[in-house]
Amino acid sequence: MNFSTLPPEINSALIFGGAGSEPMSAAAVAWDQLAMELASAAASFNSVTSGLVGESWLGPSSAAMAAAVAPYLGWLAAAAAQAQRSATQAAALVAEFEAVRAAMVQPALVAANRSDLVSLVFSNFFGQNAPAIAAIEAAYEQMWAIDVSVMSAYHAGASAVASALTPFTAPPQNLTDLPAQLAAAPAAVVTAAITSSKGVLANLSLGLANSGFGQMGAANLGILNLGSLNPGGNNFGLGNVGSNNVGLGNTGNGNIGFGNTGNGNIGFGLTGDNQQGFGGWNSGTGNIGLFNSGTGNIGIGNTGTGNFGIGNSGTSYNTGIGNTGQANTGFFNAGIANTGIGNTGNYNTGSFNLGSFNTGDFNTGSSNTGFFNPGNLNTGVGNTGNVNTGGFNSGNYSNGFFWRGDYQGLIGFSGTLTIPAAGLDLNGLGSVGPITIPSITIPEIGLGINSSGALVGPINVPPITVPAIGLGINSTGALVGPINIPPITLNSIGLELSAFQVINVGSISIPASPLAIGLFGVNPTVGSIGPGSISIQLGTPEIPAIPPFFPGFPPDYVTVSGQIGPITFLSGGYSLPAIPLGIDVGGGLGPFTVFPDGYSLPAIPLGIDVGGGLGPFTVFPDGYSLPAIPLGIDVGGGLGPFTVFPDGYSLPAIPLGIDVGGAIGPLTTPPITIPSIPLGIDVSGSLGPINIPIEIAGTPGFGNSTTTPSSGFFNSGTGGTSGFGNVGSGGSGFWNIAGNLGNSGFLNVGPLTSGILNFGNTVSGLYNTSTLGLATSAFHSGVGNTDSQLAGFMRNAAGGTLFNFGFANDGTLNLGNANLGDYNVGSGNVGSYNFGSGNIGNGSFGFGNIGSNNFGFGNVGSNNLGFANTGPGLTEALHNIGFGNIGGNNYGFANIGNGNIGFGNTGTGNIGIGLTGDNQVGFGALNSGSGNIGFFNSGNGNIGFFNSGNGNVGIGNSGNYNTGLGNVGNANTGLFNTGNVNTGIGNAGSYNTGSYNAGDTNTGDLNPGNANTGYLNLGDLNTGWGNIGDLNTGALISGSYSNGILWRGDYQGLIGYSDTLSIPAIPLSVEVNGGIGPIVVPDITIPGIPLSLNALGGVGPIVVPDITIPGIPLSLNALGGVGPIVVPDITIPGIPLSLNALGGVGPIVVPDITIPGIPLSLNALGGVGPIVVPDITIPGIPLSLNALGGVGPITVPGVPISRIPLTINIRIPVNITLNELPFNVAGIFTGYIGPIPLSTFVLGVTLAGGTLESGIQGFSVNPFGLNIPLSGATNAVTIPGFAINPFGLNVPLSGGTSPVTIPGFAINPFGLNVPLSGGTSPVTIPGFTIPGSPLNLTANGGLGPINIPINITSAPGFGNSTTTPSSGFFNSGDGSASGFGNVGPGISGLWNQVPNALQGGVSGIYNVGQLASGVANLGNTVSGFNNTSTVGHLTAAFNSGVNNIGQMLLGFFSPGAGP
């Protein structure tokens, strides 16, 4: 091999990238061991043969044996020497290799030299880097020369070592006693420890991050491109997509220019083919910038879709410069979803990675975390193997540095905790018993038995007659109505001296009226009549001409106008009373008879010829004897549990009709004593030993729990992966969650991602969030984008910006923190265009305002200037200037009302101080209202200045029971609070402890959400700061139910534990020796039973309840036998009986009898039928009904007619004009003067009045009768009979019958006449003895294994035990809550408690109650410090201030009740 033609990248990689000297070192050790074994074998063989020849074996045969053995002995000695030489040469080659490796140039230095060259070339715009480039190239040439010289020397040295080795000679044949392995000893040949490169050098490109052949430039994808960012072939320029393009940002083939889309274009921004000229700054659609082609690009010279930056030619959604792939963030990336510079692989976070899923730089493998790793899944630097943690490892699955084998440097532990056996020795002698059964007395049992005989059968079904069914349907007190008619209004009717207009009467609606009919024996029926409507339209009324009072009147110029109405009829409505309705329906249904002549199903002919037979069979032809049964059983396990009669067993009652005279008893049994039973037991054995295995296997990496091996630290999930704290498969980096598809970077959640803090699928950059979930590719790149298929900075789905300057903002262009809205300056605002903090609304300047366009603090409403201005009852106030005003358009302080100017006025339109009333001017008093102390207070019971509510202490409070300055709400302690029961400053919400909270029940500051403990939380029930979601514990979390920082998903960062503690089986060995018995049972005598019985009634039912036998654990080893068992005769002597019984027995019920299957082999021939079903006739059902009753009386009350208003306007225009006046002056002047208009005016009068009220008198309709006879009957119905003709039957039958169950049956009572008399004789059961039984028991078994499951579920927060999820620490009760140590629902803060069954809502520290804030308060609706309510937890106390005890108290140290 000519090493001089190879660059240093290849020569250094060949030395450093292979297995190293480890295999050759192992070979040297193996050869040395073989040499020692051969030398030992030669010495042993020589010793044995010499001893035989010289001592125990003499003669010619021994000499012949010695001569035969000599060649083999010589061969063993020569082979041992030759193996030792091989070991020496192998060690020499290891030393040669290590010397070469130490002299070679490190690959990292070569890569750094080339990287520096690329950087200098790209920045050498004006030739300023020429000296540095020359120096870099000179250093590179020196590296080349060093590598060539070292490799040449290594080749010479390795060749010399190899040439010194000689082949082994074959051993002599036909000596079967020689070890067989010597015949198979290999002739080892030492080869150089040189490995080939892992890939094939076929790129021949000059530049950076090129993929393809013949490239010159950077980030090219294809062949023969000159320039940068060109995917395709033969392109010259930047960012061209296609082939044979010259220029910038062209899409297509053969284009010359900038931003052209198509083929063969020459110019700028042309779209189409073969065009020339200037088309525009961009081609394509939706592009913003210069020379872009494609769709939706922003920047300069981009092609593709949705790219942001300069010269991106990738297919879609790149952010940066010169990216040719998809969804990349950075510079010159040719892959997919990379974050960094010059990555040709996919999903990398870093620079110049050829592989995929890498976090770091210059990794040619995949899923590495670190630098210069040619292998895969490595964590560290320069690892050529796979799944290594460390540096420069050429093996696999190793931890450390410079390992060349596999599974090296792993740390594990394996051992067993053994508890030794514990001895068991129990010796006992004793007995069981005696057992005494006391006397048992059975009292007299009375019997009554009477029987008079009975017959069973025949059974006839008589006709079944259904008698007449009476129908008594009577209605009394039925009502129709009442019917209510609402008021009827006629619209106004214009009144003019002309025809009237059409009069329209609006629709008249009649509402639903109840209809209740009560029927005798039938549930009352409630219905209704209506609703309905009546539309009435009156035509044009005709009014006759008005006769003139005198000629010419009324003149034409007189106008009469006005109106009549509106007219309202029935102004109070109209009610038509209920109409009585009584209906009496009589009659009946039936009678009718079913089966009047009975019904008989005739016999069904059945002819079957059965051939075959059953039997014969003999049971026990020679008798049967059961001999003694030896018993030797090793029984382990347990018996049971099992349940006899799981549902119980009920024996139905047996009717017994017997009249027996006499009685039985009383019976007394004597005491029965069982003597003591001797018992002797000797127990010995042991418990244990107990072995608890402990094994912690050594695995790659440190602290990994992945299913498949991983490198790095504390990785979990499927594996393999690299890095630190990653979850999933195929990933790299730090604290990423990837699933099974892999990712890279830092704190990313989702597959195929790179960068930092991204959430989604196929996302690169910083803090981007996909809305498509983790299963769908989002193609995101850039910074802070939310949605999908976006590139750039802080963009959303609508193409707008999400840029905010601050934390936890939800909106656009906010300056501050935790704002919900747009264009806010400050923190904790809900709305837009606010300047300040804690405002709810739009356009306010200040803090704690609710509304819009307020300037100041704590205002409720709009356009207020000042602080603590509000409307009545916290309604919206408008246009107040000042503070503490309640109302609108007030100027000044503490005014209550509207339009006041001054201080402490109560009313409207006042100008002055302390005025009460309306439109007054002056000075009324220092305070208005009542019970005020101080100056310029209005309202009641205030102490201080400029207070306008009730019961306030302080300055400028416009709410009630506030302590402080400028509070608008109720029971606040602090400054400028617009909500209720706050403790702090500027809270627009309620029940907060802190400042500037727009939400409710927060402990902290600037929380727009509710029940948070902390700061700047937009969500609810968070513990921490800047959380947008709900129930989080931590900071800057936009998801919900999570613990930690910057989570965007739900249920992230939760800690739980689940495992099983297994205790293996514990050996148990017990030996029991002893015996039981003998057991002696003495004679048992049952004395005579006097009989005098009188039996009445029956026996039963007899119910046997469930019988449960629990499990019986067994672990026995029984040896021996049982039997034979002999039961001696038991004789019961005759019992004389003398009875006289009259009565009967029965009925007797026989339960189901089950017969098991019987094997049969039958052939059935014959037929079935005919089957005839006769007609079935249902006779007619008579029907006779008679409805009697009446309707009425009906009473219609009077209809009132309301007054009709009438208004007439008369207008008479008057014009006064001086007519023409002729004149003639001495014939000199002739003419006229005028006409001269003097005046024009109107004379008018309005006539108003109306008609008088009137009405229509009511009337009544007398009752009238109702008689509806209904009679008849249904027609008879006959179901025709039918017949089934005979049909043949030829069925071969074989097999067996199924189990047959004979249903139970009943035997009717039958007569009994049996004379019974006398009594029973005494009965003696002879005693018997059970001899003693030796007891020898050996029990071997164990205790366990015992599995103890341990499962600690994960939940939001830490140590919470609330019923519903909570954030924070150690909260308990119903929840949800936030904070530390709270008990109950809706709580924030520390150590607060809501009593059981209350709705909650508490903030602060050490409060007990509900709807409270502050510190150490007790009660309902309390703020401040150490206040106590005396009205319990269910009643609002409205306390504020410090150390008050009572209700409606404020200020400091007040007892009792306030105003």
Swiss-Prot record:
What SUPFAM superfamilies does the entry give? PE/PPE dimer-like
An example of a Gene Ontology BP annotation on this entry? symbiont-mediated perturbation of host immune response
In its keyword annotation, does this UniProt entry include Membrane? Answer: yes
**Compartment(s):** Cell membrane; Secreted, Cell wall; Cell surface
Q: Which Gene3D superfamilies match?
A: PPE superfamily
- Annotated Gene Ontology cellular component terms: cell surface; extracellular region; plasma membrane
Specify where it is mainly localized. membrane
Keywords from the UniProt entry: Cell membrane, Cell wall, Membrane, Secreted, Virulence
* Superkingdom of source: Bacteria
The record's function comment reads: Facilitates a shift in the ensuing immunity toward the Th2 phenotype and could aid in immune evasion by mycobacteria. Interacts with human Toll-like receptor 2 (TLR2) and triggers functional maturation of human dendritic cells (DCs), leading to secretion of IL-4, IL-5 and IL-10 from CD4(+) T cells and induction of Th2 immune response. Maturation of DCs involves PI3K, ERK1/2, p38 MAPK and NF-kappa-B signaling pathways.
Family stated for the protein in its record: Belongs to the mycobacterial PPE family.
**Subunit composition and interactions:** Interacts with human TLR2.
Protein name as catalogued = PPE family protein PPE34
Which gene is annotated as encoding this protein in its UniProt record?
Answer: PPE34
